[in-house]
Amino acid sequence: MNIGPDELKRFQEAADINEIAMMLGRYVTLMDQFDAKSIYEELFAKDDPEVSVEYDTCGTYRGPENTRAFMVDYFHKNLSTITRDKHGWLDFWDAGTPHIVVAEDGLTAQATWSL
């Protein structure tokens, strides 16, 4: 079976989209654990000067330092009083409507979800 360059590009884009979707699953798991530091360390391109995070109710934070500071500060300010063992909790994450666009060069992507 010969796979041409166009088909190979389509397969790679599909694999990239799947990997990004799997990252969202990891994000939800880490949110359940209130682990903002790991969210930043594991899921953000922390060595990229253009890294950013945007939450509709909190604004946009650009650059590695601002992105990390937001993640850690947000969790500390908003979730530090919540018990970590979650005894008696019923967690439900509705993470849907994914929109993942891989750049033409395949080097970057942008993604949004309704959470």
What residue ranges belong to the model's regions?
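Short, low-complexity N-terminal intrinsically disordered segments enriched in polar/charged residues
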Residues: 1-38, 42-46
